[in-house]
Amino acid sequence: MKINGVKGMNDVLPADVARWHEMESVAREVFALYGYREVRTPAVEHAALFARGVGEATDIVNKEMYVFEDKGEELLALRPEGTAGTVRAFIEHGAFVEGPQKWFYMGPMFRRERPQKGRYRQFHQIGCEAFGVAEPYLDAEQIALLADYFARLGVTAELKLNSVGDAQCRPAYLADLKAYLVANQGALCADCKDRIERNPLRVLDCKVESCQPVLEQAPQLLERLCEPCRTHFDQVKAGLDALGVAYRVEPRLVRGLDYYVRTAYEFTSDALGSQSAVAGGGRYDRLVETLGGPPTPGIGFALGEERLSMILEKVGRAMPERRPAVFFVSADATGALEALRLAAGLRRAGIACELDPRGGKLKAQFKQAERVGARWAVVLGGNEVATGQAKLKDLQTREETPVALSELAARVSG
């Protein structure tokens, strides 16, 4: 009986992995320019970390998190996002004593959502977290980092920007928003009605068409920011203007996690259709303290690799992919053994090569050489081994020339 993969757990096959290598290598290059260093945290954490950090009222914790008891009866969870685990590591290892820190991560996350295009139950994120600086110009710098990253990949993405206030101005706004939503709940979808009590801010993020007339008339937090939050937001915008980063203020932009304060932002792409968000982040100045650390401001973002890969494929960006320089075509057993020896020498010299240990018809071997994208084919048999000379075929020009086996590396390394 055939066993298929688990629903929503997607395979990334070799033909697609080149895009993933490109996304990740460019991320490492760009992040290093801004002083971010890589951290690797486990995929399994205590479930309480996300209940306290992400928020018990969020859909992630309530509906989507994979939770299980291990043999020691501890309640554990597969991480649904990367920030809480990174903050936990920052606290646990005392990194706060070293002053401001800039970290980034890459890896799989897990949410039991309904699988759809660009959204899987195991998905991969690249994220940055900066700790220890509350000033708004850090917000602008981190957003510029993400804009630089997309530009390096050749991706066009629109930046949407908002402020979600803080503990000084948000409670009064939430009370007004909740009252408005309750008064108009008859025109809202079932999910929105459920969120009114648990997480009214998330109602503003609803994409259901029938809800839009109500949401368009909803109170806006931007109009009710306290003076410190207003000043912070103005300075973030000034920083982005100074850096030449274009943005659009989006008053209904909220993030789905409870820990965000003040700056919230999102990059979207038309290439994804309705699932347009490719990256998002914001400020979380009380999260470190909430998870048991000293008061430490922070800001971070995460981008979805699956969605970004879909964009790169759609825009037709050429991906660098290392193909073998040489394919050895064996005419007989003597040639196959010599091919094995020569291939080892070329690889030690840093030259990629392949051979087919099965041998077989020369025509089939040449077809395989072209299928794997080799530049050169070297034909070897007993006569070639005896004379130390072989036929070297350029698979692009179709030209054949003799080559001394002792000079093969020099001929194919150019």
UniProtKB/Swiss-Prot annotation:
Its main location: cytoplasm. Its EC number is 6.1.1.21. It is found in: Cytoplasm. The keyword Methyltransferase does not apply. InterPro entries: aa-tRNA-synth_II, aa-tRNA-synth_II/BPL/LPL, Anticodon-bd, Anticodon-bd_dom_sf, His-tRNA-ligase, HisRS-like_core, HisRS/HisZ, HisRS_anticodon. It comes from the Bacteria. GO terms for biological process: histidyl-tRNA aminoacylation. GO terms for cellular component: cytoplasm. It catalyses: tRNA(His) + L-histidine + ATP = L-histidyl-tRNA(His) + AMP + diphosphate + H(+). Keywords: Aminoacyl-tRNA synthetase, ATP-binding, Cytoplasm, Ligase, Nucleotide-binding, Protein biosynthesis. GO terms for molecular function: ATP binding; histidine-tRNA ligase activity. This is Histidine--tRNA ligase. The lineage of its organism: Bacteria, Pseudomonadati, Myxococcota, Myxococcia, Myxococcales.
